[in-house]
Amino acid sequence: MSPAAGAPGSGPGRRRLPALDVRRFSPVRKSRPVPPRAPGRALEVLVLLCSVAAAVAAVAQPLALGRTLDLLLRDGDAGWWLPLSAALLLGELLLDSATSLFTGRCNATWTASVRTRALRGLLRTAPEHARPYPPGDIGTRLTLNAADAGGAPAARAALAASLITPLGALVALALVDVWVALCVLTGLPALALLLRSFARDTGATVAAYQRTQSLIASRLLEALEGADTIGAAGTGERERARVLAPLAELAAQGRHMWALHGRALGRSGVLVPLLTLAATAVGGLRLAAGELSVGDLLAVGRYAQLTAGVGAAASLLGAIVRAREARRRTRELERMTATVYGTRRLPPNGPGELRLCGVRVLRGGREVLRADGVRVPGGSTVAVVGRSGAGKSVLAAVAGRLIDPDEGYVLLDGVRLDRLTHEALRTEVAYAFERPVLGEGTIAEAVADGARRSSRERVRQAARAAGADGFVRRLPHGYDTPLPRAPLSGGEHQRLGLARAFAHAGRLLVLDDATSSLDTATEHEVDLALRRSVRPGTRLVVAHRPSVADRADLVLWLEDGQVRAVGTHRELWHTAGYREVFGAGAGAGAGAGAGAGADAGAGADAGPGPDSGAATAVGGSGPGPVRRPEPEEARP
């Protein structure tokens, strides 16, 4: 793994894409298609009308100019044909200008619409559904691909007009002289085959180009997040090579794409003059035979150019092909499976009892969590411990319905989480994470934002409970300091995430490794404030330190995705496997007690001991004895 992958040195100052954490606070509703914005449709129609009108003016011009020339040569006065010709020229110029104006607005409007729908689809889904898409890939889809896809409506309108021009010119040419029209018609199949081949070959190349572009963007974002680690390790050149490794493939696809484009333009550039020359030659012969006038010959030459101009549609066709591939990529985000909420609410004044019934979570066909009959009493604090990959974060996500289990269900105060309304769930379940995403607003806004916006006083109380009030007040503008201008350390950033969770604490509060960047003394102070200053409720804490597990009422020990045992920290410490989770090993001995390996002072306000009544209320499908591991003799 590259140093960027873990990004331990990325720090809070390096903003991550809010792909996952924003979703946790987004008002997700039942999935339904988002209709296109009406202004985009109106602008598309305007582009089409202006393009078609310009094409009609272009087709009418040669006839008017030819008639004007004949009248001037014969009578010296063209009458109303001269101002008509001038009006057609001026009209085409104005219509082309209007087309350019409306095309720009149409592209911008549709790009915003595509980007909004893709982003909504991303925010509606559960985090595990977005996990296969790296942040760089998502960023590319929402920026470059959305812009390409947004240009499709205007490109289609322009393509339709570009086809009207040669078809109208061919009809007008047939009205002037059928023999010249037949001459031009013989060359059109070659142009049609040219466009068909260009569209077929370009599609695969554009798709490969966009995939490679997304891969480079993803690797670059990883490197930027881990820039501190890369600099400290001195692996900048290696990371540069890793990020740019796909560049050769990108260059090859880009050269191939432009080669196809150039080949199409080159071939059409040969065919168009040949057709024009042939039409002019036939027209000259017809003029010599007395079948055409000088004005008719002028019209014939111009109509031959317009008819053969179908080859100019290659660039528009290329834009449509790129837009089609880009739209396919943005539509993948738009159509992601949405989280559906129910209509029920929690019973009032519930204690926050949590039950996991027959829960199984699979990833890639592999079981990462199995929890059946696990009951957490309301108002208790339960530490979730286990080795890396044991399923701690998965259990924390399932407990508050950040993800839905593949089998089974979760109850909160007797109500299934998947049957709760979004407001009921997010009001009563709060989260704090290892790397909170706080946005770009002020500190007060970051802490206050949630399912319900917290008051200023509640924000301050939550900040004091999280140990953040002191350093926030020392900032130049206090709570009104914009986060991008706040020089926060990793621990301070994490404390603001805790403050946000405390400000919105309901009957269930889940701390997913949310104190990993705090020193042990600060962590202990936060734990005390959590018990005294935050709304009472059930706490589910993903713990990596023995001191945290010791202060909890109960410990839920996970191993290989399954519940190994449930009990107090002091009871489980008698098991060598449990001690090894904290790196204590068998040599620590059962007599080391709950505080073994804990940080200094962490046990000052430890939770209940082995005789606590809370121990008998957790572990099975109902009240009963705690499931404990088989005791192992401590080795000296």
UniProtKB/Swiss-Prot annotation:
One of its GO terms (biological process) is transmembrane transport. Pfam families: ABC_membrane, ABC_tran. ATP binds at residues 386-393. It is a multi-pass membrane protein. It is found in: Cell membrane. Residues 589-636 are annotated as: Disordered. It comes from the Bacteria. The keyword Transcription does not apply. Probably involved in exporting SapB from the cell. Expression of the ram locus (ramA, ramB and ramR) induces rapid aerial mycelium formation in S.lividans. This is ABC transporter ATP-binding protein RamA. It comes from Streptomyces coelicolor (strain ATCC BAA-471 / A3(2) / M145).
